[in-house]
Amino acid sequence: MAKVFAYNMPQATENLPKKEGKKTRITKTTPPPQKVIPPLSQMAKLNFAEETLPPGYVKAERKMKKVLATFNHRKIQTNRLHAKAAEWFPVIEPILAAYGIPEDFKYVPLVESGLNAGVSPKGAAGFWQFMPGTARTYGLKVNSKVDERKNLRKSTIAACKYIKELYGIFDSWTLVAAAYNVGDNHMKKQINRQKQDNYFKMRLNSETGGYVYKLISMKAIVEDPARYGFKAPKSVLAFHKPLSATNVE
């Protein structure tokens, strides 16, 4: 894009007396830096747990581009998530590895709760947004005195148990992520009804249908923030007020 200069063109002043007055300032206007969204041809390289978009499947590639652009417009919020990721991923990553869960699942609590331990209107709570019944099923205490869904280490262990069980059902990490969002029974019904087991080609509700795309977008931006016009995590740590140490003990 050409650079724009705003200024007044001087007129010929031959044999005319010079006029006194304020000097005209030359104002240089440059366009704001553009955030780089990969072209459609490169979308297939993006992946979740090594599962990529179907090659040449333009519908999925366009959806991926749209979700990436949405994250770019949420710059301040995403910068805060960068800060939280820098602090809490070191707690989550070794637990995922111990259970044989792909590291990309660390982005689930980032998308689910923004790595906050709050309670949703539906009753889901904690970093991994467990419902009370599911939390108890996978070993978490949830009662009037204690809620281990808000403990990052314990809730991550519970999430790994659940995710591993889901993989035994679906044999696909993208389907596992979708089932984590909407429930395994719903996903099984959709797979049987549509006779389709490729997440990217399935017709799902808007939240679940965009869920894995959000995970991939968050992964892309956190791993390479400069490419998408964001600051590096260390430079935005001031946005994040650390949680109590009891959340990880």
For each feature predicted by the language model, list its residue ranges.
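Active-site metal-coordination segments of metallo-dependent hydrolases
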Residues: 81-82, 145-156, 202
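Solvent-exposed, polar/charged alpha-helical surfaces in well-ordered, non-transmembrane soluble domains
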Residues: 83, 90, 94, 106, ...
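Substrate-binding/active-site groove segments that recognize
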Residues: 123-144, 156-159, 163
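Low-complexity, Gly/Ser/Thr/Pro-rich intrinsically disordered linker/tail segments
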Residues: 227-249
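Catalytic and substrate-binding regions of cell-wall glycan-acting enzymes that process beta-1,4-linked
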Residues: 27-71, 126-129, 133, 143, ...
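Short loop-to-helix capping motifs
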Residues: 172-173
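Short, functionally critical alpha-helical segments immediately adjacent to catalytic or ligand/cofactor-binding
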Residues: 101-116, 176-181
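An acidic, Gly/Ser/Thr/Pro-rich helix-cap/linker signature
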Residues: 1-99, 230, 234
